[in-house]
Amino acid sequence: MKNYLLFEIGVEEMPSRFVGSTLEQLKNNLSKLFDENRIAFDKINAYGTPRRLTLVVEGLSDRQNDLEEEIKGPAKKIAVDAENNLTKPALGFIKSKGLSESDIYFKQVGKEEYIFATIKQDGKETSEVLKDILPETIKSVVFPKAMRWGGKNLKFARPIRWIVALLNDKVLEFDLEGIISSNVTKGHRFLGESTIEVDSIEDYFEKLEKNYIVLDQNKRKEMIRKQCIEVANSLGGEVEFDEDLLEEVTYLVEYPTAFYGEFDVDYIKLPKEVVITPMKQHQRYFPVLKEGKLLPNFIAVRNGDSYRIDNVKAGNEKVLEARLADALFFYREDTKRNLESYIEKLKTVVFQVKLGTIYDKTLRLEKLSADILDSLGLVDEKTDTIRAAKLSKADLVTGMVGEFDELQGFMGKEYAKVGGENDVVSEAIFEHYLPRFAGDILPKTNAGVALSIADKLDSIAGFFAIGIQPTGSQDPYALRRQALGILSILMDRKVAVDIKVLIEHALDNYSELDFDKEEVVEQIMNFFNERVKNLFKDLGIRYDVVDAVLSSDINDVSDMHMRALELNNWLEKDELVEMLTAFNRVSTLAQKAESDKIDESLLKEDAEIKLYNEFKQVKIKVNELLKDKKYGIALDEFASLRPVVDNLFDTVMVMDNDEAIKNNRLALLKQVYDTMLEICDLSKIVYK
């Protein structure tokens, strides 16, 4: 019989940022516990609000699958004495497993015989096992911040106030540190009943709906979206949706009601982002636009119905008014001075104790961004880029950014414009923070590209130079994100630049620090290569393809990407296994070579002479193709050597007894291998 399970954890209001990830953990952890306990099921659905986390399991089996497991005991030589009697180790094994002597047998494993026994265990009723599994599911959830309450040892994001556990229509009663599971849930805190008894899963959903709970977060999100659109339409505008904000608001409410508020039209004169930032970041409101311009309205979502919505509206308007009044004040005060006048104050802001102040960082950015422009061949942009570097951090000490730090970079751009800086300088000040997160926009101007790379690389180089590197899940200075930002920019621009050279330039700006430059360069290169692996994996490129490309000692990420894509496609060719097998043998033997110097007079066999002659022609063609970045065709050309390589291995003993002949053949294979490495290392490709 197929059964269903209803499992609800009732909590005090959880932070919205925790709800989605907690549901995912609960779902995954319960699924894992089902597998470990041999309980079959069809699927698990997860639903959540700020006050409840619910799992609905469909297709549960009646009982565990029976267990039959072969277990291994001590070796026969210590399990049986000279008289063929069982020894203490053997008897101890039998006793510990609840066996009798007749249950054991001996099996050969390698060169030894061992005691074995087959344990059979009948499966328990699912209802019995669930009473252990469900508490464990709750305990297994991990939070960035958790709390204890009421003298309990249990830790959770917020105190657990009730638990519902139903298998079909039967209550699964268990005690989780004084919290007794039942069939009693609660409705909306203000609109619903405080005690709701449920008899089945259908009854549960029906009663929650009657008590103002929209349990399904996807349904709740679409309700919010639809309501916001309707409200915006009534204002003659369009709502500007931010999907992250929409997700957050979804997990802030159990029963959403959207409404609009108004603010003084004078605030519209402020830069758009200055108005939108406190709306979204601080108040969780959605802005309303008409033809791309802000209207003096916002849309908020209430956790409840429309009762006395005017009071709620007035309260929200009052809070936003205070925020916008602060923003207007800071804007007026900040623009009384030009942006350059704030630079001096950067000398008082510490970047990192050993790496100096933010002012020191801007000096390094002026040098490094100029070096990057040289590497990119964009020297005409140098004057504007250096100017942007000088001003890049000045907005950090303005009143506006002090109050709304999300506006860093943007306010620098705005204040630069107000102060008369040209568009290139102004835009670069904003763009140097890009990308700020995964999927963010990338800098478009040359000055912005150079300054963005410089800013991120300066941080990475500095922290590595003083021995601070990301470890495990710890990355307090977001160095991984900054490295991915650099790689994303370089791939987007498709520019040929040696990242190792840029790293060396960045480290040159830290000459006052005591570190081994060669060692730190290697550490940073390894760090970037790990990021390349992650980035390419996200782009759907096989891990072994990435390893093959990285083994070619290429430091140009745009070029790496092109090679990886070409190799990914090339691996679809016929006779792939035969090709890879041949060149794997080349790789293995080539690494035994002491030199790549070939003495033609020592080439005696027809097969090695033919390989040598064909290889010379192929090498010339491959080098020409590499210059034109035709990597797929270069691979085809190199792979054309396979027949003569196979012939060599079939007819010639490479490891000849004559040392000179052996070394000469190894040198030939090394040259073949080195040419392969000019494209990629095919020996890294995994095949069946």
Curated annotation (Swiss-Prot):
Broadest EC class assigned to this enzyme: ligase
Single annotated GO MF: ATP binding
Location of this chain's protein in the cell: Cytoplasm
Catalytic activity: tRNA(Gly) + glycine + ATP = glycyl-tRNA(Gly) + AMP + diphosphate
Pfam families per UniProt: DALR_1, tRNA_synt_2f
Entry keywords, A to Z: Aminoacyl-tRNA synthetase, ATP-binding, Cytoplasm, Ligase, Nucleotide-binding, Protein biosynthesis
The EC number(s) this enzyme carries: 6.1.1.14
A cellular component term, taken from the record's GO annotations: cytosol
HAMAP family found in the cross-reference section: Gly_tRNA_synth_beta
Matching NCBIfam families: glyS (TIGR00211)
Complex formation: Tetramer of two alpha and two beta subunits.
PANTHER family on file: GLYCINE--TRNA LIGASE, CHLOROPLASTIC_MITOCHONDRIAL 2 (PTHR30075:SF2), GLYCYL-TRNA SYNTHETASE (PTHR30075)
Protein family: Belongs to the class-II aminoacyl-tRNA synthetase family.
Protein name: Glycine--tRNA ligase beta subunit
